[in-house]
Amino acid sequence: MSASRVTLPALFAGLGTLAAGVAALAVARPGSIAVEPVAAIPHATPQEFPTVSYDGTFTFVRVRFNAGRRSFGGFGRARNPGWAHDYPYADENFIKILDEVTLLGPNTEGTNVIDAGDPELHSYPIAYVSEPGGWAPTQAELDNIAAYLGKGGFLILDDFRSNREWANVEAIFNVVLPGHSFRILELEEPIFNSFFQIETLDLPPPTFPQYRPIFLGLHEDNDPEGRLMVIANFNNDIGDYWEYSDMGYYPIDLSNEAYKFGVNYVIYAMNR
């Protein structure tokens, strides 16, 4: 893996409040749709995906999933498939920040890409899913993700927007966790205070500013007081902030906020 290009002093020079809010559309809560798993297709691999061996050290894991005919494609520099959007820079930059500001001692030598249907995923407590709006799960993926969450795993869903993509995500998790419903998360939720004190949930999306960002979660036993198993950064893309945080595309304070959300997710999940 290439070395991180994040300039830590610049990124954390001003861990302050967000800039003023952004014009946005109201979010509608679409009804569920039936998931129709499709046959697995060969993974699109425009680049190498080196991995690191499991040794018990916290390692950033990205989920590679079956996109089938529903793939929306990424907007990253290499136009990776949706599940690889912002890879590898977002992953590398985030893990360097996590190492810098916490005592977790994460693996800074590399990150992993693991198939959604691979039981190896169970070795890692937290996994990141990019563009789940284009996920067309196989039965093996549905079963493995259900087992992963049931055993204590935590999923971060990022980089998706629109009612169409939300309907796909909601339908997938209606199958993975029947009887569970996503609920809108408020600022007072423990996950937003697990390490950094998040001051606002109005983190403007780096792209598609016409959408209003919203955070939603799935809780164990569908109990709002229970363990949060899945968090969805709906109508947002914190991975994009991570990827371009050293290139001047976005204001430093917004990149800082995106990192704070990610760090909080990890610390929350590692302590529940």
Where are these regions (language model features)?
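Short alpha-beta junction capping motif
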Residues: 60, 126-166
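Hydrophobic alpha-helical membrane-insertion segments, chiefly the h-region
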Residues: 16-28
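Active-site-proximal beta-strand/loop segments in catalytic clefts of secreted hydrolases
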Residues: 63-66, 129-132, 151, 158-160, ...
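An acidic, glycine-rich "communication" segment
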Residues: 41-42, 72-74, 162-244, 258-259, ...
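Extracytoplasmic/secreted envelope proteins and their assembly/folding machinery
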Residues: 91-95, 142, 146, 166-170, ...
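Aromatic-Pro/Gly-enriched surface loop or interdomain linker
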Residues: 27-126, 132-133, 237-272
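Bacterial N-terminal signal peptides that target proteins for export
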Residues: 1-17
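Surface-exposed patches in mature extracellular/periplasmic domains of secreted proteins
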Residues: 104-114, 157-161, 180-188
